[in-house]
Amino acid sequence: MKLLMTGLLASAAVAAAQEQQVLQAEGSAQQQPAPSIFDETLKQFESGLEEGITHFWSEMKTNFKHYLPLISVPKEHTRRADSEWDHVVRGADVESVWVQGANGEKHREIDGKLQSYDLRVKAVDPAELGIDPGVKQYSGYLDDNETDKHLFYWFFESRNDPKNDPVVLWLNGGPGCSSLTGLFLELGPATIDKNLKIVPNPYSWNSNASVIFLDQPVNVGFSYSGSSVSDTVAAGKDIYALLTLFFKQFPEYATQDFHISGESYAGHYIPVFASEILSHKNTNINLKSVLIGNGLTDPLTQYPQYRPMACGDGGYPAVLDQGTCRSMDNSLERCLSLIETCYSSESAWVCVPAAMYCNSAIIGPYQQTGMNPYDVRSKCEDMSSLCYPQLNTITEWLNQKSVMKALGVEVESYESCNGGINRDFLFHGDWMKPYHRLVPSLLEKIPVLIYAGDADFICNWLGNLAWTNALEWPGHKKFADAKMNDLKIVDNKSKGKKIGQVKSSGNFTFMRIFGAGHMVPLNQPEASLEFFNRWLRGEWR
């Protein structure tokens, strides 16, 4: 779904720790000393850290016992026997295949370390769940048997021409939000009503493409593990293995164009995942482009745009008063200095304080208003459902035993977003890292689309426009100088309707989508399918 507010504020972590303490019976709080490795590592780094960062980590050490309950824990699960699956693809078998090149040299048919991976596949009966009857579906798990990681996926074939239509991987953000929220809340073939009934979605992205929805990293949605993944780079090799084994099992899709799409924290994921795929010479993944919606990709350039978006300069009325806006301005210099230090070292020891300070000083004032951080036009009625009560309905439907059985699910329960994963990534310094630095190398090989609903605060269109204009790459000047043009519907009965603005140069495209919040397909389903279809057909690239 979205960039989780759980990890956004320094006060959020502290509040959670305090709440944990309050809920304990009086006198039951256990005083646990911080692990000695924490003291030793901090001592090694103290000489190189500025005073403010050293003070931050000293406080963390003092309160370390409060943060331990916040780290994600493994899920209860029962692994089904391989004989219960329709297909099992062994990574070791794929890795063992060698072929002879045109000049007689031998090389592996498919690159990558695949030996520890398996892919389990179940053919899902559409009639059993009532979702997209007549459309071929598969679900299952990618297993990394070496590290006990199991990623859940759900594949929907194109409604139109699956033999020729492209294949798209969809990733939600968080970090820690299930891509099944994107399936049922945004762009999948169906939604769930309050009576737990299936409602078909005429604007599903599988109208003209086959779509894979993936729960990642581990312990998100229906995925599980005895260990954890706490940074974006660590997840990249899993994605490569999943796609490689999936296309090996289903070669009919491997020859078609493949695209990676996602939103929010996928602004971190996608540059890394695409770079991992493109780093392999011999592969069965035909990657043609990437699409990032309302993403967090370059914090140093995006964070200065929070104040303008909250204070009336983003096309919507101001949410904050002038005094609060001035306070955000006063905090910005310190915030940017911390992010610059993070960019220089990429060490958690400086990246964590940068995220904690900036999220508290720059994003915190907005959250305190009670407005929806994902849509400046509305209040947040229920923060426990991330301001979208529909998530509760989706979660209830997916937790039905009949649904889990039909999908081959191996965990005991489903939750839409895992706050523990969010905090894991935050406290490992992943939040503020400069993943935008990977984009120039992507642009050398494939087109990149950055789109943004213009009513979102948390990954707002101003910040996304700013970082795309600022990105250093050979086509920088032409892109930055390109004018924004009207984006209009051309594909259906709404032909001529203005849905946003677009600018494009070389392999780089930016879109502003009018009247949409953080989740563009939710607020503007017709507009989202319009630009999605046209992008896949090659327009603007």
UniProtKB/Swiss-Prot annotation:
Name of this protein: Carboxypeptidase Y homolog A
Parts forming coiled coils: none
Role according to the record: Vacuolar carboxypeptidase involved in degradation of small peptides. Digests preferentially peptides containing an aliphatic or hydrophobic residue in P1' position, as well as methionine, leucine or phenylalanine in P1 position of ester substrate.
Propeptide residues according to the Swiss-Prot or TrEMBL record: 18-122
Cysteines joined through disulfide linkages: 177-417, 311-325, 335-358, 342-351, 380-387
InterPro entries, alphabetized: AB_hydrolase_fold, Peptidase_S10, Ser_caboxypep_ser_AS
Alphabetic keyword roster: Carboxypeptidase, Disulfide bond, Glycoprotein, Hydrolase, Protease, Signal, Vacuole, Zymogen
Pfam families the UniProt entry points to: Peptidase_S10
Assigned GO CC terms: fungal-type vacuole
Glycan-bearing residues: 208, 507
Similarity-based family: Belongs to the peptidase S10 family.
Gene3D superfamilies in UniProt: 1.10.287.410, alpha/beta hydrolase
Glycoprotein in keyword set: yes
GO MF annotations in UniProt: serine-type carboxypeptidase activity
Biological processes, Gene Ontology terms: proteolysis
